[in-house]
Amino acid sequence: NKKIVIEWGFFALVEFLVSESKNIQNKYKNALDIGSSHGNHTKIMRHFGLKVDQIDKYEKHAEINNDFNSYNFKKKYDVIFCSHVIEHQRNIGFFLDKIFDTLTDFGVLVISGPKHPAERFVEGHIQSTIMPIFLQNLIFAGFDCKNAKILSMAGIENSFIVKKSKTFNL
């Protein structure tokens, strides 16, 4: 199926893939799509030449049909893409620490979450991804946010493209 569906996190993913397109073949060989759902983002990453594994505990067609937080990965990934999964996490610190540990030393995280006020209740969203909270959680997990790309779509989502910090220290 050649059809590409634009979903949450699409613009951050395309920003990363287009800006890094010359490096994908030699710098970024594999990727993990957390909460991959129907695989639309996976198709886009594969189109750019990445070898992508999908993990989704609700989607039986994912290569890894399991919960990201409890799955024991046998390898590390150069790129991790995570779109609109973080707001559903009971422990955002554990989730981001697991992502950090699953990335290679020079790995990149492309992550997006909904942009709505923290006081607005959205069923199933138990974490806020408003910009200052999202940013602080990424910093505390060890990501280099000084050199991050930040995309904020009015009223829709906040996204970060970040690398692991080489000098992280709290």
State the predicted function of each range.
Residues 89-99:
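A short, conserved alpha-helix within the catalytic core of class I
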Residues 144-148:
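Short secondary-structure junctions
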Residues 106-114:
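Conserved beta-strand signature within the Rossmann-like core of class I S-adenosyl-L-methionine
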Residues 1-75, 79-81, 94-96, 127-133, ...:
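Conserved N-terminal segment of class I S-adenosyl-L-methionine
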Residues 25, 103-105:
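A generic alpha-to-beta junction signature in SAM-dependent methyltransferases
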Residues 83-88:
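Short catalytic micro-motifs in class I SAM-dependent methyltransferases
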Residues 62, 117-122:
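A short acidic, helix-capping loop that chelates divalent metal ions and anchors anionic groups
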Residues 114-119, 152:
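Short "lid" loop at the C-terminus of a central beta-strand within the Rossmann-like core
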